[in-house]
Amino acid sequence: MSDHIFFASAPKHLGSLLAEELTRLGMAGAAETRGGARFSGRIEDGYRACLWSRIANRILLPLAQVSLGGPDEIHDSALEIPWEDHLTPDRTFAIQFDGQLQGVTNPHFAILQVKDAIADRFNRLYGRRPSVDPDDPDLRIHLYGNRDSLSFSLDLSGESLHQRGYRDAGSAAPLKENLAAALLLRAGWPEIAAEGGALLDPMCGSGTLIIEGALIAADIAPGLLRERFGFHGWTQHDEPAWQRLLAEARLRRTAGLKRLGSLRGYDVNPNAIRTSLHHLERAGLAGLAHFERRELSDCHPGREDDEGLVIVNPPYGERLGADEDLTQLYARLGSVLKERFVGWRAAVFTSSPELGKSLGLRATRIHSLYNGPIECRLLSFQIEPRYFVSHLPRPLPPEERSPGAAMFANRLSKNLKALRKWRQRDGIDCLRIYDADLPEYALAIDLYEGERRWVHVQEYAAPPSVDPKRARQRLREALGLIPEVLEVPGEQVFLKVRRQQKGRAQYERLAETGRFHEVSEYGLRFLVNFEDYLDTGLFLDHRDVRRLIGSLSDGKRFLNLFAYTGTATVHAAKGGAASTTTVDLSRTYLEWAGRNLELNGIRGPNHQLIQADCLRWIDSMAGQRRFDLIFLDPPSFSTSKRMHGTLDIQRDHVDIIQATMRLLEPGGRLIFSNNLRRFRIDLEGLAPFEVSDISAQTLPRDFARNPRIHNCWVIQHPESASNRRNGSDDEDRHA
């Protein structure tokens, strides 16, 4: 049989996902279109879509499309279609109309016109006609109006495909089965299931998400439970082809059930659990998923479940008329996820992005969907501490705090007090106030002040010898106390986890909020971002290095290599540099540097921003340009698709410094810095130069407890150092 063009309808905003699914099913030319997706193939392909599509509402086989001069042409247009090729006089049919037709205000008018045309054609051919059965017809005819165009199709589905056959009608506030499947697909459940991950719904309701998750994980065709489809009453139905598809689906089901992993659904309502178990049995999955009455606060992973997906459709304002404070419900859900499901992924389906913020988690992806007429968002999360950014735990009552928590609070308060006079004298607005002073509370805490006060907390990853539960408890104590001691709202406290970084991991984007805040340093203005990256855009330990650069820059040609957000360039320019050149591989950070320059009124051709691999750029500039002052602050280790090879600062620093010194004017200075704690400078390899260690002089007071936070040297050509020692240059007094 020749190929046909089929149309698969889908819930709003799911056309692209449906097209992807149809492509995976082997459908030719699957493409999103208005209201769903189109594909081509044989009748057997239409059957396959009915059997296997988890997302489609209906599979339609178009018969004709006509342009109408007016509503009175509907009857004659329908009369021309050979309905006898699809229906016999002793069978029944029903007609459904969607869309809008010019001149037709009541869809029932179009339905009656087509019904009469079918009756007239059959009466003319056979002297009798098929009857109309709106509830259980042998054949469903679908009409779609679009202005003056009317399309006629056969509905191969019969009942909507979301009706799998396992759920009772009338369940309270149902999530339709195909929407539930779409949520699971968007959340990455097929990949998680393939890797042996678990699925858990802490508010499972009638169990739809868990059952659809089981069908996906076990490779069970969603239409396998249905006894009847729309094509069964069609005169051209190919029963052998249908039986072949069923046989294949049954074999795949048998194989898939053998690899089905952990599936758990919890709900506080015992009736919901009973309904879920009933639906599970009707789906032929009795005993293969676990449903249990549990409060949200009692929700835990299964004992054997190390990772997986938590997916949930919490109540929202329009749903069920829930009386509970939904903000508190979302906050409790977020706390459960952060405390018990670290390493998992999560997906929350909500009608309110504002409620989603109460979770205290930064979404990695957001999809727009509809639950019936209600516009919703599917928020996808990775449950990792680096995504915990707000809504911190409330401080534990004094009677519940451990002695260690009290010591932590006291130390934080004392540190802040001890630094107060120094801050006021030097005008320091951004500083480190705690750096793992108590080993049990392995945190670095930085205070930023601008139009508001913010706290940036970095947790040092605990070694394997530390009990993860104890570490989480201490973190929770600390996060509860920080807002109290520092008098900062919880939403202005941001948490990151500091692990040993590989490649450019410390510069990789964590989120895309685009929220920047202005802070100041020695009268200069900088933009910081607490959410999107591991670091904020302002390295506080280099504060005195930047001030030194500013003091040495008057009239100088300044070069900033591995420039990050260009803060050193701002100091140089405001210190009177004749020109500045800022080089970094990242377009993102160069744009950030440009904003910092603009914020301080620095603009013009004398201030260049160059996106380039710094090592290649240094080599390319040899013999072409010279600079009087160079700041070289490379990462400890780096690799990038756009970078030539890798950079290991311990291994490569001599070569890099030698190459950079070729760009340094006689009499100039190279300031070389890095943050590798175990770094050892190779003085023998740098013997041709004068090397002065200024690490101690450039260590800010707030970092005194951690003297190895950075290493810093001034490197000069020998004649430059000799001249300065003889007093020919008085700039050394600034160092």
From Swiss-Prot:
Its EC number is 2.1.1.173, 2.1.1.264. It catalyses: guanosine(2445) in 23S rRNA + S-adenosyl-L-methionine = N(2)-methylguanosine(2445) in 23S rRNA + S-adenosyl-L-homocysteine + H(+); guanosine(2069) in 23S rRNA + S-adenosyl-L-methionine = N(2)-methylguanosine(2069) in 23S rRNA + S-adenosyl-L-homocysteine + H(+). It is an enzyme of class 2 (transferase). GO terms for molecular function: 23S rRNA (guanine(2445)-N(2))-methyltransferase activity; RNA binding; rRNA (guanine-N7-)-methyltransferase activity. Its main location: cytoplasm. The keyword Methyltransferase applies. InterPro entries: 23SrRNA_methyltr_KL (IPR017244), DNA_methylase_N6_adenine_CS (IPR002052), RlmKL-like_Mtase (IPR000241), RlmKL-like_Mtase_CS (IPR053943), RlmL_1st (IPR054170), SAM-dep_methyl-trfase (IPR019614), SAM-dependent_MTases_sf (IPR029063), THUMP_dom (IPR004114). Residues 45-156 form the THUMP domain. SMART domains: THUMP. GO terms for cellular component: cytoplasm. It is found in: Cytoplasm. It comes from the Bacteria. Specifically methylates the guanine in position 2445 (m2G2445) and the guanine in position 2069 (m7G2069) of 23S rRNA. NCBIfam families: PRK11783.1. Belongs to the methyltransferase superfamily. RlmKL family. This is Ribosomal RNA large subunit methyltransferase K/L. It comes from Allochromatium vinosum (strain ATCC 17899 / DSM 180 / NBRC 103801 / NCIMB 10441 / D) (Chromatium vinosum). The lineage of its organism: Bacteria, Pseudomonadati, Pseudomonadota, Gammaproteobacteria, Chromatiales.
